[in-house]
UniProtKB/Swiss-Prot annotation:
Compartments (UniProt record): Cytoplasm
A Pfam family of this chain: NAD_Gly3P_dh_C
Predominant subcellular localization, coarse grouping: cytoplasm
InterPro entries: 6-PGluconate_DH-like_C_sf, 6PGD_dom2, G3P_DH_NAD-dep, G3P_DH_NAD-dep_C, G3P_DH_NAD-dep_N, NAD(P)-bd_dom_sf
GO biological process assignments: carbohydrate metabolic process; glycerol-3-phosphate biosynthetic process; glycerol-3-phosphate catabolic process; glycerophospholipid biosynthetic process
Gene source species: Shewanella baltica (strain OS155 / ATCC BAA-1091)
Protein's name in the database: Glycerol-3-phosphate dehydrogenase [NAD(P)+]
Length: 338
């Protein structure tokens, strides 16, 4: 079946819209679908996502499609950009409408709620083994991406042909450098754990601990990410790249990050519900914390920063007490013997 679009993007929030704008700015015919018909009608009329990316006009190659069946019929390349807690649900909706030659990539960052499973496992459970899968991840704030400010990301998947296609599709000499990576697991994990550590960095700054503490927390957070990744068979080198260190530093240090701002509010004394309300959008790290903590416990991986953030979010511990517990942990070597 011939494509009438180069790619269909599922998810018309800030990040899905930004990726659609970036793709269309490359000259690729891009369809953008979202679950809310009223929102989609507004996007089509305004030629701009005023709710999430105000003032950034859609390129001519970007089209809005409110009908999921039509959106999925238009292209065999499907980019899913929805919150992690509805990732499986969206795939269930899409499954009977997918073309037989469909290829699925996602930019969703997180794990499956409750179980802590990787999204590749969710996708395989829903879709079976028929379709090539891929993930893209890296330091990409939606607004900067949509504005055409330069950054770099990584792409990994189950099929090298599809991965290489995505590199070519997404890459732009002016705005986006794209690296191929063969670590499918590592790229997915980095996007989930960095959200958790960003909440911790925000809490640290909210308490008033300063730049030294923030940097120490980021560094030890990277250690926790690498530990968990290696336990799942990921390549430790992945976490020194765009989907690891790159995304971690970005999310922990800039107030465009909803996760960091959520942590800041907690560190300044807000309760969890009030802090979430202040953000006004999905704070992926809130759910990610429980998911990552669950996964680490199941695998027996030590993640003390993640554990303390979990206790703040779900057990009512104060950020100050969490910091005290981290600082009073047993002394040990930074590089334990292998």
């Amino acid at each position: 079946m011939k494509n009438s679009a180069d790619i269909t993007v599922l998810g018309a929030g800030s990040y899905g819209t930004a990726l659609a704008i970036s793709l269309a700015s490359n000259g690729h015919k891009t369809l953008l679908w979202g679950h809310d018909p009223v929102h989609m009608q507004t996007l089509a009329q305004d030629k701009c996502n005023q709710a999430f990316l105000p003032g950034i006009a859609f390129p001519d190659c970007l089209q809005i499609e409110a009908d999921l069946a039509k959106a999925l019929a238009a292209s065999n390349n499907v980019l899913v950009v929805v919150p992690s807690h509805v990732f499986g649900t969206v795939l269930e909706q899409a499954k009977p409408l997918l073309r037989s030659d469909a290829r699925i990539v996602w930019a969703t960052k997180g794990l499956e709620p409750e179980t802590g499973r990787l999204l590749q496992d969710v996708a395989r459970d829903v879709l079976g083994e028929q379709y090539p899968l891929a993930v893209l991840s890296g330091p990409t704030f939606a607004k900067e991406l949509a504005m055409g400010l330069p950054t770099a990301i990584s792409v990994a998947g189950t099929c090298p042909t599809f991965t290489n296609y995505l590199v070519e599709l997404l890459h732009s000499p002016k705005r986006l450098r794209v690296y191929a990576n063969d670590d499918f697991t590592g790229l997915q994990l980095g996007g989930a754990v960095k959200n958790v550590i960003a909440i911790g960095a925000g809490m640290s700054d909210g308490i008033g601990f300063g730049a030294n503490a923030r940097t120490a927390l980021i560094t030890r957070g990277l250690v926790e990410l690498t530990r968990l990744g290696e336990a799942l068979g990921a390549n430790a080198a992945t976490f020194m790249g765009m989907a690891g260190l790159g995304d971690l530093v970005l999310t922990c240090t800039d107030n465009q990050s909803r996760n960091r701002r959520f942590g800041l509010a907690l560190g300044k004394g807000c309760d969890v519900m009030t802090a979430q309300a202040e953000i006004g959008q999905v704070v992926e790290g809130y759910r990610n914390t429980k998911e990552v903590f669950t996964l680490a416990k199941r695998l027996g991986v030590e993640m003390p920063i993640t554990e303390q953030i979990y206790q703040v979010l779900y057990q009512g511990k104060s950020p100050v007490d969490a910091a005290k517990e981290l600082l009073s942990r047993e002394k040990k070597s930074e590089t334990p013997a292998q």
